[in-house]
Structures are given as structure tokens and as C-alpha cells.
Regions:
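A conserved helix-loop-strand patch within extracytoplasmic ligand-binding domains
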Residues: 1-54
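N-terminal segment of the mature folded domain
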Residues: 1-2, 86, 194
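Alpha-helix/helix-capping structural signal
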Residues: 42-43, 84, 187
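Small-molecule-sensing regulatory modules
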Residues: 50-184
């Protein structure tokens, strides 16, 4: 983030999972051997190949509409996208399947809209705090701390998802896809979870 700016608030998180949209099939298991799957995310590539090493990964660029159009034109057999982006655009793609986090863990902050303002604009910060979603903020802080401690970025094969369950326990899953090391913690405080995971 540029110096002088900061995240002032975050809105309530949309579903953070990934979605697989297929041309003719309906899910990851039924894709034909060697099917062409479109994604340019190293995180998604590592995880999908862990489940289906036979798949052929092809680079996928452009906005969501362009990506789906290229799928249905036959350039791909399936594509991987963030479910939140598809939902926010009101798109209901055919032959789609929301992937469980046990199959593909999302990127840190996936599904979250953050509002940024100047660090010296105290008045704006106070205004924006009124629309801040505290649970989402705690989760995002944990995920971003995990990513930062590993020296990761949006181009790193690192996944992280924090959330509260129905009993208000704080849950955290982290994944380093290079070594496929899966870290999990069940704690009550976001900062404690991060410390435990990074020890």
C-alpha cells in the first residue's frame, strides 16, 4: 500500500470460496483427463493440481465477463474464479460448483471489500469506522499478518482463511502451497492464532 494510506474499515465479508465454472461438466471430479483449466493464480494452480494433477492449466486474464465468455467459447474446459466477484455482479453461471475450503483454501482477504483513506484524515477515519464490520476486520488482520510474516504477496502460493464459528470460536486455516503445509488453529484471539501458526 502506498505510504500515507491505510485501511480505514472493511465491509462484511462475502463468501470467500472459489468457484469452478465448467463448459460442459459440473464439477472438478468429472472433468475429463487433461481438461484445460483457466487460472493465473499460483495459489489456485497448486491446490487444484494437488487434487487433479492430470489437468492442464492455461493462463486466464481479463475481467470476469471476459473470462466467462472465453470459457463458453471453448478456449477452456473450466475456469476458477473467486465466488464473491461473481456474486457481486449478479452472474449465475451454468455448470458451476462452489469449491469447499478443504479442496481450495482462499487467498488472504478474499471476499472482503476494504476502504482506504489517508492516514492523516482523522475525521474520515472516524466516519468510516461506523461501517466497519468488526468480525471481518479481525479475520482480515489474522490473514494479512500470516501472509506478511511469510513474506507473501498476491503472487505467492499462500492461502489463509480466518472465521468465527457458531460458538464464537476463532478458526484459522493457513496453507503454504509450495510445500503443501497445511496449518490449522482453533483459538479465541486473532493475534494469538497468528503467533501459534508462525512459531
Amino acid at each position: 500500500m502506498p505510504s500515507g494510506l491505510q485501511i480505514a474499515c472493511v465491509l462484511k465479508r462475502e463468501n470467500p470460496k472459489d468457484i469452478l465454472i465448467c463448459n460442459t461438466e459440473k464439477n472438478l471430479k468429472t472433468l475429463k483427463k487433461g481438461a484445460r483449466v483457466g487460472t493465473s493464480s499460483v495459489r489456485r494452480i497448486a491446490q487444484v493440481l494437488n487434487v487433479r494433477p492430470d489437468l492442464k492449466i492455461k493462463s486466464l486474464r481479463g475481467n470476469i465477463g471476459t473470462r466467462i465468455k472465453n470459457l463458453y467459447s471453448g478456449k477452456y474446459d473450466a475456469i476458477l474464479l473467486a465466488l464473491a466477484g461473481v456474486k457481486r455482479l449478479g452472474i449465475i453461471p451454468r455448470n458451476s460448483n462452489t469449491l469447499p475450503i478443504s479442496t481450495i483454501l482462499p487467498a488472504a482477504g478474499q471476499g472482503v471489500i476494504a476502504v482506504v483513506c489517508r492516514k492523516n484524515d482523522v475525521q474520515m477515519q472516524r466516519i468510516l469506522r461506523n461501517i466497519n464490520h468488526l468480525d471481518t476486520e479481525k479475520c482480515v488482520v489474522a490473514e494479512r499478518s500470516f501472509l506478511a510474516a511469510l513474506g507473501g504477496s498476491c503472487q505467492s502460493p499462500i492461502a489463509a482463511l480466518a472465521r468465527f464459528n457458531s460458538k464464537r470460536s476463532f478458526l484459522f486455516d493457513g496453507l503454504v502451497s509450495v510445500s503443501y503445509t497445511h496449518l490449522r488453529a482453533h483459538e479465541t484471539e486473532a493475534d494469538l492464532v497468528c503467533r501459534l501458526l508462525l512459531e
